[in-house]
């Protein structure tokens, strides 16, 4: 799959997903991305993730993107973001 073959996913309002399985570059600096939609709108994203530019492009759509590095605790980051999302209701 190349960059021109991107698929679309829709993130529901006030929902979050993990994109670890959609990162396709071995040189990508993160092992996972947590994507949070804090808005009241559905937001369409492109997958898979090919480069770091993807992060900034999707932040401009109103999404919160939390990169997960090799030394980060994924579950702790997920729980933190979920708590922040629920607290903002």
UniProtKB/Swiss-Prot annotation:
InterPro entries: Energy-convert_hydgase-B_suP. Pfam families: Ehbp. To M.jannaschii MJ1436. This is Uncharacterized protein MTH_1236.
